[in-house]
Regions:
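Intrinsically disordered, compositionally biased charged tails
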Residues: 1-26, 32, 273-274
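Solvent-exposed alpha-helices and their adjacent loops that cap or buttress functional pockets
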Residues: 16, 153-156, 208-212, 231, ...
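Basic, glycine/proline-rich low-complexity segments that contact nucleic acids
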Residues: 28-213
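Phospho-regulatory, Ser/Thr- and acidic-rich intrinsically disordered linkers and terminal tails
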Residues: 118-119, 183-186, 197, 204-208, ...
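Structural motif
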Residues: 159-161, 215-218, 236-237, 257-259
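Short His-Asn-centered micro-motif
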Residues: 163-166, 219-222, 241, 261-262
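Short, solvent-exposed amphipathic alpha-helical segments in soluble enzyme
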Residues: 177-182, 231-236, 254-255, 274
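Nucleotide-binding motor/catalytic cores of P-loop/tubulin-like NTPases across gene-expression machines
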Residues: 225-248
């Protein structure tokens, strides 16, 4: 098989990326029921630099503009005492010696606050964005990169993990956990559960108190019961082929996410054009 050497995202050492070949198809009990050939779309060039660029652009374009109120820190009646009093010439509340409103005073306005007019997004060429997505898709078929990203799974599994369409008919989370355990990937969900911690900084007061590691990426052909049964497990993302992008395939710009795909979803992905 053709081989190409590339640099890892977070390490100086080199890894060998091979051309993907045949993959096993697993049932809900983890048994191999057949083989399938990985689509040609998985054999595109692996470019970690473009993957990072694509993820950065996607995340930047998600940002919402923010700014303080235009009148923040200025809701006072103030005046200055002027010179000759032996005190600083700052604005003070009327009838009081308390300084106010100036940026250097407690409770005053900010000197140069963020503006809602500022464009926080980043531009990227369409072809470059597509190349980043396909490169991240290619990385999911490389066991070396998946392991380097920290995912835990049975050594005998072929990646990406292809499962029969019966997976989409699972009706409960309990059944989903049993299936993931049988296939040999539930250890990665446990890694996400054990890695849950309280976020450092102000974010924990703003609706994002906990930081949870990214675990399995589940790709289903359509909105289904199977997808709903696993999406509440820590670290798991459930998407359809149309919703795949570089950000979900390589969270944080680190390629090699552990991916579980139904047979129907794989057929849809195989129909993509480069």
């Amino acid at each position: 098989m053709a081989e190409k050497k590339v640099k890892k995202i977070k390490a100086e050492e080199e890894v060998t990326v091979t051309t993907p070949g045949k993959l096993n198809v697993y049932d809900l009990e983890g048994k191999v029921t057949g083989e399938t050939i990985l689509p040609e779309i998985f054999k595109i060039e692996y470019r970690p630099d473009i993957i990072r660029r694509a993820v950065t652009a996607i995340e930047a374009n998600k940002r919402q503009p923010y700014a303080p109120s235009p009148t923040a820190g200025m809701r006072h009646s103030v005046s200055t005492w002027g010179k000759g009093r032996g005190v600083s010439r700052v604005q003070r509340l009327m009838g009081s010696s308390t300084a106010a409103q100036s940026p250097n005073n407690v409770g005053g306005r900010r000197a140069h606050p963020p503006k809602v007019e500022k464009d926080l997004g980043k531009k990227i060429n369409k072809k470059e964005l597509m190349l980043g997505k396909l490169g991240a898709l290619r990385a999911t078929s490389e066991a070396v990169l998946v392991k380097a990203r920290g995912h835990k799974f049975d050594e005998k599994l072929t990646v990406p993990i292809i499962v029969k369409d019966d997976f989409e008919d699972i009706k409960s989370t309990q059944e989903a956990v049993k299936a993931l355990s049988s296939i040999g990937v539930y250890d990665d969900v446990r890694r996400a559960i054990d890695g849950k911690n309280i976020r450092a900084g102000r974010g924990k007061m703003r609706g994002r108190r906990y930081r949870i590691p990214r675990s399995l990426l589940v790709v289903v052909s359509k909105e289904c019961k199977g997808g709903r049964s696993v999406r509440n497990l820590p670290g798991i993302d459930v998407v359809t082929p149309n919703a795949l992008n570089a950000s979900v395939l390589a969270p944080g710009g680190a390629p090699g996410r552990l991916m579980l795909v139904s047979e129907s979803a794989l057929v849809t992905i195989g129909g993509w054009k480069r």
